[in-house]
Regions:
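Mid-domain alpha/beta scaffold segments of enzyme catalytic cores
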Residues: 1-214
Length: 214
């Protein structure tokens, strides 16, 4: 079994299983031996020909699929078309469903930090919440860490933020970037002043612990 080094991408990897591919629940078609996350993205709550009810129905079925490792992207985005109250409702639905199905939650967040922290306090999840594509400053990273979040870094981020994240709360991802995950590991290792192989092994253990152990 391959443990993916890349926890969030929108592209199928050359070797199935090397990355967790993010999919919409209504269009999910898995590759043999691939790994996936599925969720209702805040951008597409209302801007889709598929109804929200149908998306929820598909999602509830897919979270029991053996190749689906995580819920997400779920999130809050003040630049999205859907109203913030509706986004909060859909996010809370997905967060509670992640708890019911024993899945970590991969989070898309834009300009809604306070709202997210309030929801975490309300829901009090047991399963990890992971901020994907974190680009904030170190002070924001510290706040997330105090509230128990994990952080995933992509191609662009604040170097000091990466440096302060404890090794057991760290992930790397390509998201929509064409930069290889190997290059991202090499850069992160240089920034954190740790050998690239050691960093990969640390993140591999994190992935195994968070995404595979039930």
């Amino acid at each position: 079994m391959i443990i993916p080094a890349d926890i969030h991408t929108h592209c199928q990897p050359e070797v199935p299983g090397e990355a967790i591919v993010n999919c919409f629940p209504e269009t999910f078609v898995p590759q043999l031996e691939g790994w996936y996350s599925v969720g209702i993205h805040p951008w597409y709550i209302t801007s889709s020909t598929v109804s929200l009810a149908e998306k929820k129905r598909c999602l509830e079925e897919l979270l029991y699929h053996p190749q689906v490792l995580a819920m997400g992207e779920a999130g809050l985005d003040k630049l999205a078309d859907a109203s913030l109250p509706l986004q909060r409702e859909v996010f809370e639905y997905q967060a509670r469903l992640a708890e019911e199905t024993d899945k970590p939650l991969v989070i898309h967040l834009v300009k809604a930090v306070d709202e997210l922290l309030k929801l975490k306090q309300k829901i009090r999840p047991v399963k990890p919440w992971i901020i994907h594509g974190f680009r904030g400053k170190a002070v924001l990273a510290e706040e997330y860490l105090r509230h128990g979040f994990h952080l995933s870094f992509g191609e662009r981020y604040q170097e000091e933020a990466l440096r302060i994240v404890p090794s057991d709360r760290l992930f790397l991802e390509t998201d929509e970037s064409m930069t290889s995950i190997d290059t991202l590991y090499e850069r992160a290792a240089m920034i954190s002043k740790s050998p690239s192989g050691e960093l990969r092994e640390t993140v591999r253990k994190n992935v195994e612990e968070i995404f595979f152990r039930r």
